[in-house]
Amino acid sequence: MSPGIGMPELLVVLVLALVVVGPQQLPVMMRKVGQMMAQARAMAKDFQNSFEEIGRETELSELRREIDALKQANPINQIHGELDKAARGTQDDDIRALKLKHVEQNQAETDADKAAKAAKLAALDSEGPQSTTPEADARADAAASADETERAAPVETTPAKPVDEIKGR
C-alpha cells in the first residue's frame, strides 16, 4: 500500500473539519490551509533549486578545470613554445658570432697597427742615431697619425653626376 492520502481519508478529514470548525468558518480555514501549503511547496522548490544550482556550478567548475588541463596539454602550444625557444637560441648564436667576428677584426687591426709602428721604429733605428729635437718628434708623430687616419677611414670617391641626371631630364 502506498502511504499517500486516498479518497476515503480525505472524506474523513473534511467531515472532521466541518464538525470542529463549523460550516461558516470552513471556507476561511480551507483558504488559510491552501495558502500555507502553497508557501510550503514554494520553500521546498527553492531549497531544491538551490541544491541543483550548487550541483551545476560544481559540474561547471570541473568542466572548466578539464578544459584548462586540455589547453595546457595541447601539443600545438608545446610545439609553439619549443619553436620560440629554438628561435631565441638561434638569434643568440648569431649575435655571439657577430660579436666574436667584430672582436677578431678589432684585434687584427690592433695587431696590424702594432706591427706598422714596430716597422717604423726599426726603420728609424736602422737609419742611425738621430737627434731628438722637438721638430723631428713632431714630424714622426704627424706621419704616424696620418697613417692611422688613412687606415681608419678609407675614402671612396665617386664621380659627380651632371645636373641633368639629378633633375631627371
From Swiss-Prot:
According to its UniProt entry, the function of this protein is described as: Part of the twin-arginine translocation (Tat) system that transports large folded proteins containing a characteristic twin-arginine motif in their signal peptide across membranes. Together with TatC, TatB is part of a receptor directly interacting with Tat signal peptides. TatB may form an oligomeric binding site that transiently accommodates folded Tat precursor proteins before their translocation.
What NCBIfam families does the entry give? tatB
Per the record, the similarity remark reads:
Belongs to the TatB family.
Q: Subunit info?
A: The Tat system comprises two distinct complexes: a TatABC complex, containing multiple copies of TatA, TatB and TatC subunits, and a separate TatA complex, containing only TatA subunits. Substrates initially bind to the TatABC complex, which probably triggers association of the separate TatA complex to form the active translocon.
Q: Where are the transmembrane segments?
A: 2-22
Gene name tied to this protein? tatB
Region: Disordered; residue ranges are 106-169
List the PANTHER family. SEC-INDEPENDENT PROTEIN TRANSLOCASE PROTEIN TATA, CHLOROPLASTIC (PTHR33162:SF1)
Q: Where in the cell is it found?
A: Cell inner membrane
Q: Write out the entry's keywords from A to Z.
A: Cell inner membrane, Cell membrane, Membrane, Protein transport, Translocation, Transmembrane, Transmembrane helix, Transport
- The identity of this protein, by name, is Sec-independent protein translocase protein TatB
Kindly report the protein's main subcellular placement as a broad class: membrane
Look up the record and give one Gene Ontology term from the biological process aspect: protein transport by the Tat complex
Q: Which InterPro entries match?
A: TatA/B/E, TatB
